[in-house]
Design a protein with these regions (language model features):
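Bacterial Sec-dependent N-terminal signal peptides
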Residues: 1-27
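Alpha-helix termination/capping residues and helix-transition junctions
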Residues: 14, 169-171, 232
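Flexible, low-complexity junctional segments that flank or bridge functional domains
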Residues: 20-210, 214-223, 279, 287, ...
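Conserved acidic, small-residue-rich alpha-beta core segments centered on
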Residues: 188-323, 329
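Charge-patterned, long linear interaction tracts outside catalytic cores
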Residues: 326-336
């Protein structure tokens, strides 16, 4: 079974469970929309136990705290603000409430983290004669180290693209894959890229699916495997560069790569976002999106809230002033050892 099929199997289960559940009907009133949102999260959000352990989240207490703020005559804008504040209690940057006029989101997960990326400085490394293979930009640095920048996994990464890219970089003594500021995209593209860095089937993580409405109703962890590509594969050291804006499918890419031989993760903690998403709609048409099926790395550690690098590095002001990227320079040193 391919890793893609194995990874997406729980989505079907989640959908089946949702379709078989009794659907509660709520009035399209401030109170009805509040009740609908609180219950949707209560029955489907998958990190309550983790959050309770981390900082003592009590979702029942949150209900009573915010119910007092709901009034029959409150405006749509006022209701949106209260519901957004209630979702903030989850402290989860991957929980969003969508309305026609705005999107409620929790941005504090970025706080305390430097940008650790500069497009202006990146030009210094890519130059003007770098090559482009669909979603990849690549070049060879002066010290004979290959460099690939992957700005997004929304752009197709085909097998032919990877053949050409890796063939051109085959003379290099090592490779840097930069996924900083990559907000994700199509997981299959991330898997296609990762499959070029292992010679065998590798366990890369686990996933659980919802089995009921209680906060702890999850299946036993099911393994996720990455199948090795049957085409040109890389056999030399690799450094993957990350920052807090590496999330969603990129977070999964980092999770996979850290399980592979010869790979070192360098930079800052990723932004997370590996849990399988679930969407639902409120009576007034607003929609909410959050993680409903938790995923873990190969050591059964949560990856939803970010993956720590093997070597933590921050860009320094001194290097910035000299047009240097501290994280890239560190990766070059690691490969050059």
């Amino acid at each position: 079974m391919s890793v893609r099929k194995l990874f997406h199997f729980p989505i079907v289960l989640c959908a089946m469970l949702a379709s078989c559940s009794k659907i509660e009907v709520y009035d399209n009133t401030p109170k009805g929309n509040f009740e609908a949102l609180w219950n949707i999260i209560d029955e489907r959000y998958c990190f309550f136990d983790y959050k309770a352990e981390e900082y003592g989240l009590d979702w029942d207490a949150v209900y009573h705290q915010y119910k007092r703020k709901i009034a029959d005559d409150m405006s749509s804008t006022g209701l949106f603000e209260v519901l957004g504040d209630m979702l903030d209690e989850l402290r989860d940057g991957h929980v969003n409430l969508y309305a026609a006029h705005d999107v409620a989101r929790y941005w504090n997960f970025h706080e305390g983290y430097a940008a650790n990326f500069s497009e202006e400085i990146l030009v210094h490394y890519l130059g003007t004669d770098y090559k482009i293979a669909s979603g990849l930009r690549y070049t060879i640095l002066p010290d004979n180290i290959g460099y690939i920048y992957v700005p997004s996994f929304s752009n197709s990464i085909g097998e032919g693209n990877l053949d050409e890219c890796l063939h051109a970089l085959a003379i290099c003594r090592g490779l840097i894959i930069d996924v900083r500021d990559n907000g994700g995209g199509n997981l299959s593209y991330a898997e296609t890229l990762a499959a070029r860095f292992t010679n065998e089937r590798v366990l890369t993580g686990y996933i659980c699916h919802t089995t009921g409405k209680e906060h702890s109703d999850f299946s036993s962890p099911e393994p996720i495997y990455l199948e090795s590509s049957d085409r040109l594969r890389w056999q030399k050291p690799v450094c993957v560069l990350t920052n807090r804006s590496s999330y969603s499918a990129t977070n999964d890419f980092v999770k996979i790569m850290r399980s592979l031989p010869l790979v070192t993760i360098v930079g800052d903690r990723t932004g997370g976002g590996s849990g399988l998403p679930f969407s639902s709609e409120l009576p007034n048409g607003w929609s909410v999106r959050f993680s409903a099926c938790p995923s873990f790395d190969a050591d059964m550690r949560h990856t939803e809230f970010g993956i720590a690098p093997d070597i933590h590095v921050e860009m320094t002001d001194e290097d910035r002033s000299r047009g240097l990227d501290t994280i890239i320079e560190t990766a070059r040193q690691i490969i050059g050892q």
